[in-house]
């Protein structure tokens, strides 16, 4: 039986609880802003984009605290409590408390993002062979949270109202804080340890610089398209999709669960396909795999272009079009979202790996912000044209990835 180092399972459980609250919120936030607080579609998508972007910028602020005497463990526990306070403010159902709550949640999420990679690397310093499996477990638990939280959150909202859903999210963050503090003495003991060996900086020079800059551009285009699963695709599901299945109507927030479920379903199939590539000549580099992910992300919107043309005039279209889109988005998430940061660290010089990783996350934040702005076009342009634009932008990213692939084969 595989034994993980002490403290790791508690760390994983706390991450799962934190992700439960976050994914519960993102599955409901757009509808909450639009239907409950009276925001227009453009305003709601803008707020959503700014909020998610802030969760990728806030780790830079949180690192200033956790890198000092305060420490990663204390900073993470405090981040959970700050986020819990933010969720509790949403219970008030007013615009001022909503803005304050989202600010606190973004700050808390920033502190939480620092824990898994930093602490897991130190926990597995004596067992480097289990490091990747440990991170895979955290990723799996996070996706399980993404699968169940929209269902639980929407059920609570339907039965007891919006405050009940946000109260559940707040409770999950309190539980996360309690869990990590139960093993705080173990986790603090490894904070000062150096992480395991890194593959960063394997390639240097102008070629790797061009590739790193290309990856930052790619992060913008990728996340611009991926964020629509939490924004305009919910609106498409609500207003343009026939959601009736055997007499049961699929609640709109369940779309987020469908996406997470497809990620979990596609993951082993994709892993098996990539494993076969390892025994074939001409194994694709990470850049080529990322290019495939960008291609899948772009093609994901092709079914919705067709569906929008078929549904022109107000008629509802089948759920299969949406499932096709989400399935391809899941492939893109597994190839780009998972490989992108590690590829950045491999290319960056050892002394600048953190800076380039920060540039990647900064580009990710910019992509989410732009996605929120683009969402404002939902009510202004034909949906077929809107989805066509979302298809073209990731395909441009695929072209950038192919250029990176050519550079990598020359290095």
Labelled PLM ranges:
Residues 49-66, 257-270:
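Central cavity-lining transmembrane alpha-helices of secondary-active solute carriers
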Residues 74-89, 96, 285-303:
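Structural signature of the two symmetry-related core transmembrane helices
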Residues 91-102, 303-322:
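Helix-loop junctions at membrane interfaces in 12-TM secondary transporters
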Residues 111-125, 334-348:
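Intracellular juxtamembrane helix-capping segments at the cytosolic ends
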Residues 27-43, 231-254:
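Short amphipathic helix-loop junctions that connect adjacent transmembrane helices
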Residues 1-2, 6, 126-127, 153-248, ...:
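Intracellular loop-helix junctions on the cytosolic face of multi-pass helical membrane proteins
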Residues 2-35, 208-232, 257, 327-331:
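Pair of pore-lining "gating" transmembrane helices in MFS-fold secondary transporters
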Residues 130-158, 170-176, 259-260, 357-371:
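Glycine-rich segments within core transmembrane alpha-helices of 12-TM secondary carriers
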